[in-house]
Amino acid sequence: MKKAGLLFLVMIVIAVVATGIGYWKLTGEESDTLRKIVLEQCLPNQQENQNPSPCAEVKPNAGYVVLKDRHGPLQYLLMPTYRINGTESPLLTDPSTPNFFWLAWQARDFMSQKYGQPVPDRAVSLAINSRTGRTQNHFHIHISCIRPDVREQLDNNLANISSRWLPLPGGLRGHEYLARRVTESELVQRSPFMMLAEEVPEAREHMGSYGLAMVRQSDNSFVLLATQRNLLTLNRASAEEIQDHQCEILR
């Protein structure tokens, strides 16, 4: 019993230290890199020269930009043209805020353009990390390939995912996930952030502790995946873990 208690204590210490390191990283200058690229480079260049560079696309009226990420051959980021830190922002549950997940899904075409041929929807995933699971303090949705093992697991659970938020059997990547099926028409009308905040008990008060992902299924529906930070299981709620930026699924 003493050994079990000691092991439990060690796990807590490790989790707290890991979280502390993550927070320390977020308080440095490098955590503002993406925001500076958007606000000091992409947006001004588009407004003054009609050139989105270094972004791939800048849509000031729609409130977003798309940037090629330096990691992976096909990974892109969708980001707002104004200050939003991340999932903890109350702006994400405001109906007047752009539906960033839907916009990010539309931006998947940049992957195909870069690849030189169509990237199948089943190979694409969207993900945003929690406050402790990210390295940048500017809201960004990762548009990238899905891990083949995650793709297979979601395919196998197609019949088990309903229109309500329920635990995904077996979780993903060793972490617990909630899963919810949504239709395209639902997704167009309502942001996944609002679905999470309004439908999962106490989620609205703890949005910053959630990572959120989205994948398309073979029946053309979408699956939303939400994971919440849990220090005891060393889960920092980095939903990006379901992605493979090297795109093995395309080989």
Swiss-Prot record:
Pathway: Phospholipid metabolism; CDP-diacylglycerol degradation; phosphatidate from CDP-diacylglycerol: step 1/1. It is an enzyme of class 3 (hydrolase). Keywords: Cell inner membrane, Cell membrane, Hydrolase, Lipid biosynthesis, Lipid metabolism, Membrane, Phospholipid biosynthesis, Phospholipid metabolism, Transmembrane, Transmembrane helix. GO terms for cellular component: plasma membrane. It is a single-pass membrane protein. One of its GO terms (biological process) is CDP-diacylglycerol catabolic process. Its EC number is 3.6.1.26. One of its GO terms (molecular function) is CDP-diacylglycerol diphosphatase activity. It catalyses: a CDP-1,2-diacyl-sn-glycerol + H2O = a 1,2-diacyl-sn-glycero-3-phosphate + CMP + 2 H(+). Belongs to the Cdh family. This is CDP-diacylglycerol pyrophosphatase.
